[in-house]
């Protein structure tokens, strides 16, 4: 795991009126087992706790839901990976502000199946792989296969579908694999990733 602060506007100095004794909330994509949860927990451990800021983690179905929570209170923040295509919209919003950028590499990614499922490589030519949209190019780069995907909201949701028998193969991470009792038939890599921390912005009427 690598966690490095690239840009620091500081949660504490965002508004001098805030007391570090107040509880802040870090919102990100859930459910448990996502790479976003992993990054948020590492951010809390390596930044907010060291800065003396009390914080809790809140997981949501979409990053847009996280942002809606952030817009409701100056004590609500959202962590989003730069691999998420929709992050470009968050940078444009006048009611949000970018507070920090940091690096936190993801857990290992790979193809996971249920225990007892008999996997063979030729399945990639015809099987449908359940995955979050962001990491799907791992299949292309590591297997040279043009596969079909069933897209879901998170890597954890992908693993859950395999556990429940709704899909046979998931592209997921190590945390979700463990959580849902799956095993990897292929491992790819821990993805080097940077993340943005957003807070509620202050809109100034210039008219």
Regions found by a protein language model. Give the residues of each.
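Domain-level signature for soluble enzymes in the chorismate/prephenate branch of the shikimate pathway
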Residues: 2-207
């Amino acid at each position: 795991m690598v966690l490095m602060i690239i840009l620091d506007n500081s949660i504490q100095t965002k508004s001098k009126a805030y007391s570090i004794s107040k509880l802040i909330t870090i919102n990100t994509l859930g459910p448990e087992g996502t790479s976003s949860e992993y990054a948020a927990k590492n951010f809390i451990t390596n930044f907010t706790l060291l800065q003396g800021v009390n914080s809790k983690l809140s997981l949501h179905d979409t990053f847009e839901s996280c942002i809606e929570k952030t817009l409701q209170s100056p004590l609500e923040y959202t962590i989003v990976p730069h691999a998420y295509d929709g992050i470009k919209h968050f940078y444009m919003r006048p009611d949000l502000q970018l507070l920090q950028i940091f690096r936190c590499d993801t857990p290992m990614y790979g193809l996971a199946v249920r225990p007892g499922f008999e996997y063979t490589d030729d399945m990639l030519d015809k099987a449908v792989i359940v995955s979050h949209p962001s990491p799907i190019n791992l299949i292309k780069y590591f297997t040279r296969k043009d596969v079909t995907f069933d897209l879901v909201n998170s890597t954890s949701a992908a693993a859950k579908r395999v556990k429940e028998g709704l899909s046979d193969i998931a592209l997921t991470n190590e945390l979700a694999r463990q959580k849902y009792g799956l095993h990897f038939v292929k491992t790819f890599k821990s993805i080097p990733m940077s993340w943005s921390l957003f807070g509620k912005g202050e809109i100034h009427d210039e008219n």
